[in-house]
């Protein structure tokens, strides 16, 4: 696309988004250009607002607008069961299954020696601190079923088992090498229900 500098700047920024290539960036840019100013401003303000008001939950490291995320703050959630995920984006697919009523702990990634990500780079110490609460009965390891996720789950299981807390892993059925955010609700729901103890 032969573009003015302002349009090119928009295209360059859109292409930085995950999954957005040149053609998608061009479609989005044309949509923005063709929308009235009110709609474009509303989009820009929503982006600024989310960057200004959303931070990490002080307990589980999910996204939150208050000190605690909505899940941690809910009296309806089972605080005795903690589901450990790699990233905040892994929570919505699990929530959509309607089969999990516990709380979460977001690690902020997965162990990956090749990328220089070790235990100190993740929220593992905070998870272990949460397990000092004697009411915690089970930890479900819901890291991605890839090499990094399996390595992280094995490492966590070795740390948690001696604490006397039941440790389980999502059952197979999720594709190996896949990511939770792309799993359908039925497959993910069955994986939660058929989780196995480690």
Features from the language model and the residues they span:
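Conserved, well-folded catalytic cores of nucleic-acid-processing
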Residues: 13, 17, 35, 50-53, ...
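Solvent-exposed alpha-helical segments within well-ordered globular domains of core cellular machineries
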Residues: 8-12, 26-30, 41, 45, ...
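Residue-level signal for pocket-adjacent positions within structured domains
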Residues: 27-28, 42, 55, 67, ...
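Cys/His-rich Zn2+-binding cysteine-cluster or related metal-binding knuckle/ribbon modules and their
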Residues: 2-8, 16, 26-91
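Long C-terminal interaction/binding lobes of large macromolecular proteins
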Residues: 128-140, 144-198
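Extended interfacial segments that mediate partner engagement and assembly in macromolecular machines
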Residues: 25, 74-140
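Conserved phosphate/pyrophosphate-binding and hydrolysis machinery centered on Walker-type P-loop NTPases
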Residues: 18, 37, 50, 62, ...
């Amino acid at each position: 696309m032969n573009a003015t500098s302002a349009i090119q700047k928009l295209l360059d920024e859109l292409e930085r988004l995950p999954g957005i290539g040149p053609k998608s960036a061009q479609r989005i840019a044309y949509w923005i250009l063709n929308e009235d100013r009110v709609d474009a401003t509303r989009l820009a303000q929503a982006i600024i607002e989310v960057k200004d008001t959303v931070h990490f939950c002080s307990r589980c490291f999910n996204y939150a607008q208050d000190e605690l995320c909505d899940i941690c703050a809910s009296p309806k959630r089972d605080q005795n069961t903690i589901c450990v995920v790699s990233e905040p984006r892994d929570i919505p697919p699990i929530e959509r299954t309607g089969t999990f009523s516990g709380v979460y702990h977001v690690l902020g990634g997965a162990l990956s020696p090749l990328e220089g990500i070790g235990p100190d780079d993740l929220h593992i110490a905070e998870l272990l601190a949460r397990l000092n609460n004697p009411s915690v009965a089970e930890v479900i390891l819901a890291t991605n079923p890839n090499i990094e996720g399996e390595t992280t789950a094995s490492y966590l299981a070795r740390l948690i088992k001696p604490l006397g807390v039941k440790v389980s892993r999502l059952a197979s059925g999720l594709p190996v090498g896949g990511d939770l955010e792309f799993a359908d609700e039925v497959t993910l729901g069955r994986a939660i229900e058929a989780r196995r103890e480690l």
